[in-house]
From Swiss-Prot:
GO terms for molecular function: acyltransferase activity, transferring groups other than amino-acyl groups; protein homodimerization activity. Its EC number is 2.3.1.212. Polyketide synthase producing 4-hydroxybenzalacetone. Can use p-coumaryl-CoA as substrate but does not accept hexanoyl-CoA, isobutyryl-CoA, isovaleryl-CoA, and acetyl-CoA as a substrates. Catalyzes the initial key reaction step in the biosynthesis of phenylbutanoids. The lineage of its organism: Eukaryota, Viridiplantae, Streptophyta, Embryophyta, Tracheophyta. This is Polyketide synthase BAS. The active site is at C157.
Length: 384
């Protein structure tokens, strides 16, 4: 794999992840959620929420929000109370701090001086501020003040693919570039009490978690000091036909409000083969079970329908499902948790490559639009 052509490709060189300290077990969450939102009187709604949690295939999640925070700021726990100011303040501070924790882990694994980081890409769902989280992280990490910064807000669950697409373009077109990506996601802006008229809001309360991931991307790695993990071969973005309005988020005085169509899993799964064919036809690959898979776990129904539509073997989304089980849906950061888990499991299991022993793989991001990001990956030999 270490040909001159491959050396020119952008590669992921390090991965770091972080979560808030507060761990919530899914089996206990309905009781916690309805208690802290003063909603225990909504007995039928609580039963619906319990079923959502039971069917989520999530075991635990990490959240910044605590009972103490909700007691001090009761409007956050209400369904549509004015609360944006306090949410925003927590989000701005928390996103930067959690992102810093993940970034320091990635930089430590990379093992090179921070002065070699030439570009910074930061992505988070909310917390729009000036200067933004990119500026805050530059300061918190003590990066060179001339680092070239990019800031993405309000992209959502597909954005892990977006930032890789941008990092690939930067790394391959700027000699010596080393790009630090930080995706830091918190649900502080969208936590709210239940509503009998807005049931899709409860889906988010049942599956979303907080987490940050950081990766370092560069082309032409110095193999004496840098260790590639995955090569970024190609990238693509598309809007799913007839999907307008299927996934939306609106920032209101009461925080970020999500709206989802029940048809989201069908819309995504019906179009996944087209995305695969467009990405892999140039490589003469049409056996989707010959790939390793890193798919954003928007929820179990999406994973189930994609598996069925593509004819995937059960084990293909094993790592994706494990991350969903252990962390929930952490928006843009989730695919990097999956990528990190996959390379670790490949080493633990004695497999030949970072991609479960396979050479070629695909990373998918699904989110508002419906937008689909597709990244073709190539694994590298495992070095124990």
């Amino acid at each position: 794999m270490a040909t001159e052509e491959m050396k020119k490709l952008a590669t992921v060189m390090a991965i770091g992840t972080a979560n808030p300290p507060n761990c919530y077990y899914q089996a206990d969450f309905p009781d916690f959620y309805f208690r802290v939102t003063n909603s225990d009187h909504l007995i039928n709604l609580k039963q619906k929420f319990k079923r959502l949690c039971e069917n989520s295939r999530i075991e635990k999640r990490y959240l910044h929000v605590t009972e103490e925070i909700l007691k001090e700021n009761p409007n956050i726990a209400a369904y549509e109370a004015t609360s944006l100011n306090v949410r925003h303040k927590m989000q701005v501070k928390g996103v930067a701090e959690l992102g810093k924790e993940a970034a320091l882990k990635a930089i430590k694994e990379w093992g090179q001086p921070k002065s070699k980081i030439t570009h910074l890409i930061v992505c988070c769902l909310a917390g729009v501020d000036m200067p933004g989280a990119d500026y805050q992280l530059t300061k918190l990490l003590d990066l060179d003040p001339s680092v070239k910064r990019f800031m993405f807000y309000h992209l959502g669950c597909y954005a892990g693919g977006t930032v890789l697409r941008l990092a690939k373009d930067i790394a391959e077109n700027n000699k010596g570039a080393r790009v630090l990506i930080v995706c830091s996601e918190m649900t502080t802006t969208c936590f709210r009490g239940p509503s009998e008229t807005h049931l899709d809001s409860m889906i988010g309360q049942a599956i979303l978690g907080d987490g940050a991931a950081a990766v370092i991307v560069g082309a032409d790695p110095d193999l004496t000091v840098e260790r590639p993990i995955f090569e970024l071969v190609s990238t693509a973005q598309t809007i799913v036909p007839e999907s307008h309005g299927a996934i939306e988020g609106h920032l209101l005085e009461s925080g970020l409000s999500f709206h989802l169509y029940k048809t989201v899993p069908t819309l995504i799964s019906n179009n996944i083969k087209t995305c695969l064919s467009d990405a892999f036809t140039p490589l003469n690959i049409s056996d989707w079970n010959s790939l390793f898979w890193i798919a954003h776990p928007g929820g179990p129904a999406i994973l189930d329908q994609v598996t069925a539509k593509v004819g995937l073997e059960k084990e293909k989304l094993k790592v994706t499902r494990q991350v969903l089980k252990d962390y929930g849906n952490m928006s843009s950061a989730t695919v990097f948790f999956i990528m990190d888990e996959m390379r670790k499991k490949s080493l633990e299991n004695g497999q030949a490559t970072t991609g479960e022993g396979l050479e070629w793989g695909v990373l998918f991001g699904f989110g508002p639009g419906i937008t689909v990001e597709t990244v073709v990956l190539r694994s590298v030999p495992v070095i124990s």
